[in-house]
């Protein structure tokens, strides 16, 4: 029989409930302290051993990263605290279908490694807007994508991560929200701003191990508590809250009864909350943007030792993406079984009493399971898991945002900036972004509408498809030009913003209180909207491109798939501007080590700004660029990677078929 969690709050209070502090024993606190010591130690170690004194060293880890930390960082950058809270919450509300969104990444991470990355590496770029500049020429595409990417990082990615992490921290420690967020961001900022991408990737590797270990232990406790898998499937379908009436509302049984297709990933195309055509096609379109053209993800792969290491990292990440179903979604469903009245509450006043949120408490499924089920010590380990997922994602976002700002925006403002100036600008912007993220927390608090993961998916569906369309056509269709790409992005942005603004104005509603948004705007499921927006963008891009002049092949060598293996010299569309910047940068002299004061030398040592050796000659720079743009592989390792990719695809087909 499903048990319920008795609220420990006085019903008469008008304020949000004050949850008793759960982590206040020596065992839990010791585990958390050890976690922070280990993470900071790894961050300091990677700062000392890595080259942080150049743009390539700071932003791309010197192009010398092995496959296993790179693959772990790919996974950790994607799996944040918003996944633990969001996936578990949606699982508690509607079943396992949301896990198929994670499995969708298995295919796209292989497309990234085998199709998109060879082009990016051949192009010799640091950022995705930089690739668009090389591919199409001009500045407006690069600047637009940089600004939009920074907005998405702050408004969507960072906000959802901080919100979900704050839920857990408040429940566990009873800290003030802003104090908890400030402490986390301060520690995160230290090794992100000082250490660069190498520091981020190595700490991500440690945090991936902690995430997997802690969530595996919790999964074991959860299934043991519920009586095994068969008992789990039976009890979930009976997990109905005891309070289903109140507040003068007539609540439909479908709002509090588990869905009949809760244990199927493919659901009705019309009435399903995650319709199968939207899951297969809509989420694949979003995955093209996120996994193949998003700065946070692609930057991790651009730092690999060689192409084989890059592909191996993608394969490792693909296998790890099989786990969220079992480590997050199913534990969230078990939380509904064990604590039904809290997690599955449906009456607004009851939800306010249970978790302080009228729209529902499914986002509290995973934190509640951790705090109620885990013993002392292991509870501290699970808080460390949440901190690990939160901090690993934030470090990835902060480092990538610094890269975007420095390479794509700051160089437009300061065309004669030296390498040292670019390094300082990147670090300062990282701190600015952290400050903006803290200021964004109040907006995050008022945007906790419904299920967090659906919020992330819907906003992504309104902004991401045009970007995916541009990158896909840029690589596969050389006839596309700058005018087509720009106007395709503009039309896609306008259409997406109409839907996004309408949902902010009218609200997305809930099962109990549906939204009043006009059906013609909000009546289409966000996954279907992503498909429509994607093809609208493609039509505009191709239409405008065919009506305007094509780009000569001499500017496209090794920038699109049909000209990938061309060995002729490419003439960049912005070659003259780049030469001017290089001459200006080379003319600036750096101050010598001896001329600096003690304080300045200490700051330079912390931030990796110490001199790293004599300036390279033009011949040495050309040889280095040739090395970094090399995509060749040894035949043996190419075969091994291809076999593993086929095996991973087979596993993906099997899990989809088994849970269909």
Curated annotation (Swiss-Prot):
Signals that turn on the gene: Significantly increased by cadnium.
UniProt cross-references to Pfam families, sorted A to Z: SSF
Protein's recorded name: Solute carrier family 5 member 4B
One GO MF term: low-affinity D-glucose:sodium symporter activity
Stretches assigned to the Cytoplasmic side: 1-27, 76-82, 127-142, 188-208, 299-313, 402-423, 477-484, 548-639
Transmembrane feature ranges: 28-48, 55-75, 83-103, 106-126, 143-163, 167-187, 209-229, 278-298, 314-334, 381-401, 424-444, 456-476, 485-505, 527-547, 640-660
One GO CC term, this protein: plasma membrane
Bilayer topology annotation: Multi-pass membrane protein
Role: Low-affinity sodium/D-glucose symporter. Generates D-glucose-induced depolarization in a pH-independent manner.
């Amino acid at each position: 029989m499903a048990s319920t969690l008795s609220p420990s709050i006085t019903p008469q209070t008008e304020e949000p409930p004050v949850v008793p502090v759960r982590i206040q024993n020596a065992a839990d606190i010791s585990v958390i302290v050890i976690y922070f010591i280990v993470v900071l130690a790894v961050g300091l170690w990677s700062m000392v051993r890595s080259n942080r004194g150049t743009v390539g060293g700071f932003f791309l880890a010197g192009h010398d990263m092995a496959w296993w930390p790179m693959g772990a960082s790919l996974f950790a950058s994607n799996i944040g605290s918003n996944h633990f809270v969001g996936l578990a919450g949606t699982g508690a509300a509607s079943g396992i279908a949301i896990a198929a969104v994670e499995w969708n990444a298995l295919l796209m991470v292989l497309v990234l490694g085998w199709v998109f990355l060879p082009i990016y590496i051949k192009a010799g770029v640091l950022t995705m807007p930089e690739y668009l500049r090389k591919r199409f020429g001009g500045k407006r595409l690069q600047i637009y994508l940089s600004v939009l990417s920074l907005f998405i990082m702050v408004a969507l990615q960072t906000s959802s991560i901080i919100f979900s992490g704050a839920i857990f921290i408040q429940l566990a420690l009873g800290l003030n929200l802003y104090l908890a967020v400030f402490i986390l961001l301060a520690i995160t900022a230290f090794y992100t701003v000082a250490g660069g991408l190498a520091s981020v990737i190595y700490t991500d590797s440690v945090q991936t191990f902690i995430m997997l270990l802690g969530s595996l232990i919790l999964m074991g406790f959860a299934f043991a508590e519920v009586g095994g898998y068969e008992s789990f499937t039976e009890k979930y379908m009976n997990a109905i809250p005891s309070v289903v009436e109140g507040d003068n509302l007539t609540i439909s049984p479908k709002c509090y009864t588990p869905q009949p297709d809760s244990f199927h990933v493919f659901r009705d195309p019309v009435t399903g909350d995650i319709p199968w055509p939207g899951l297969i096609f809509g989420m694949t379109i979003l995955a093209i943007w996120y996994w193949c053209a998003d700065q946070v993800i692609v930057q991790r792969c651009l730092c690999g030792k060689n192409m084989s290491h890059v592909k191996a990292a993608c394969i490792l990440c693909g296998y790890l993406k099989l786990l969220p179903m079992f480590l997050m979604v199913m534990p969230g469903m078990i939380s509904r079984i064990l604590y039904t009245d809290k997690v599955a509450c449906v009456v607004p006043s009851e939800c306010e009493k249970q978790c302080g949120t009228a729209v529902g408490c499914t986002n509290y499924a995973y934190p509640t399971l951790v705090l109620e089920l885990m013993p002392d010590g292991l509870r501290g380990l699970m808080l460390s898991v949440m901190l690990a997922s939160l901090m690993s994602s934030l470090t990835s976002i902060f480092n990538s945002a610094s890269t975007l700002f420095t390479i794509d925006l700051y160089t437009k403002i300061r065309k004669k900036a030296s390498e040292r100036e670019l390094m300082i600008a990147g670090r300062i912007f990282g701190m600015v972004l952290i400050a903006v993220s803290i200021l964004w927390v109040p907006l995050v608090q008022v945007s906790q509408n419904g299920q967090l993961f659906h919020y992330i998916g819907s906003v992504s569906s309104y902004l991401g498809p045009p970007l995916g369309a541009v990158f896909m056509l840029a690589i596969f269709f050389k006839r596309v030009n700058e005018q087509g790409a720009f106007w395709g992005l503009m039309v896609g942005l306008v259409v997406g913003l109409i839907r996004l603004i309408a949902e902010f104005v009218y609200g997305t509603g809930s099962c109990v209180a549906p939204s009043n948004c006009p059906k013609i705007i909000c009546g289409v499921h966000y996954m279907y909207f992503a498909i429509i927006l994607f093809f609208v963008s493609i039509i505009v891009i191709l239409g405008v491109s065919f009506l305007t002049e094509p780009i000569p092949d001499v500017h496209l060598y090794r920038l699109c798939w049909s000209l990938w293996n061309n060995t002729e010299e490419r003439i960049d569309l912005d070659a003259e501007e780049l030469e001017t910047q290089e001459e200006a940068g080379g003319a600036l002299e750096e101050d010598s080590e001896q001329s600096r004061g003690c304080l300045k030398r200490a700051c330079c040592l912390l931030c990796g700004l110490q001199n790293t050796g004599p300036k390279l000659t033009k011949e040495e720079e050309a040889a280095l660029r040739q090395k970094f743009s090399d995509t060749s592989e040894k035949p043996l390792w190419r075969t091994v990677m291809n076999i593993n990719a086929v095996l991973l695809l087979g596993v993906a087909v099997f899990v989809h078929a088994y849970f269909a």
